[in-house]
């Protein structure tokens, strides 16, 4: 699966806007992931004790993690699909250390699209959303391939 130059333009144009508030957007995505898919919370040792949205919103550690997630994702997206070297350490840690199933990457991908659409409705129309979904699918597929290389079936 490849994205066209125009699709990458859509992805990177909106990502430029997202980067202006990376910690906030990343934090919101992590909160929504844990709320909409509570089963994912067990994979986060430092967050599994949090039960309320208020606890999550006030967590500096969760905000930092959201920033880490979005920083890594931005680095991957900017590679325009040529992300094998950037992806390898991420896939290794997610497969062997954190044991994050690919299904959870699907969950967070959809939440990322929703949050960006809510924050930037005028700049993230149907074509941009479709391009982002495609870029995130490429990321997930490549993560799944790397998982298999590391012997994790996730």
From Swiss-Prot:
Globin domain boundaries: 2-148
User: Is this entry keyworded Transport?
Assistant: yes
Which residues are heme b-binding? Answer: 94
Q: Which domain of life is it from?
A: Eukaryota
Q: Any idea where this protein resides?
A: Cytoplasm, Sarcoplasm
Entry's Gene Ontology molecular function annotations: heme binding; metal ion binding; nitrite reductase activity; oxygen binding; oxygen carrier activity; peroxidase activity
Residues bound to nitrite are 65
According to its UniProt record, the EC number is 1.7.-.-, 1.11.1.-
Gene Ontology biological process terms in this record = removal of superoxide radicals
Quote the SUPFAM superfamilies the UniProt record gives. Globin-like
Which Pfam families does the record associate with it?
Answer: Globin
InterPro entries cross-referenced by the UniProt entry: Globin, Globin-like_sf, Myoglobin
Q: Where is the signal peptide?
A: none
UniProt feature coiled coil, ranges: none
What chemistry does it catalyse, as a reaction equation? Fe(III)-heme b-[protein] + nitric oxide + H2O = Fe(II)-heme b-[protein] + nitrite + 2 H(+); H2O2 + AH2 = A + 2 H2O
Cellular component GO terms held in the UniProt record: extracellular exosome; sarcoplasm
The UniProt entry, under PROSITE patterns, shows: GLOBIN
Keywords for this protein: Cytoplasm, Heme, Iron, Metal-binding, Muscle protein, Oxidoreductase, Oxygen transport, Transport
The record lists O2 as bound by 65
Protein family: Belongs to the globin family.
Its annotated function is as follows:
Monomeric heme protein which primary function is to store oxygen and facilitate its diffusion within muscle tissues. Reversibly binds oxygen through a pentacoordinated heme iron and enables its timely and efficient release as needed during periods of heightened demand. Depending on the oxidative conditions of tissues and cells, and in addition to its ability to bind oxygen, it also has a nitrite reductase activity whereby it regulates the production of bioactive nitric oxide.
Record note on quaternary structure? Monomeric.
Recorded protein name is: Myoglobin
Organism per entry: Alligator mississippiensis (American alligator)
Q: What is the lineage of its organism?
A: Eukaryota, Metazoa, Chordata, Craniata, Vertebrata
Gene from which the chain derives: MB
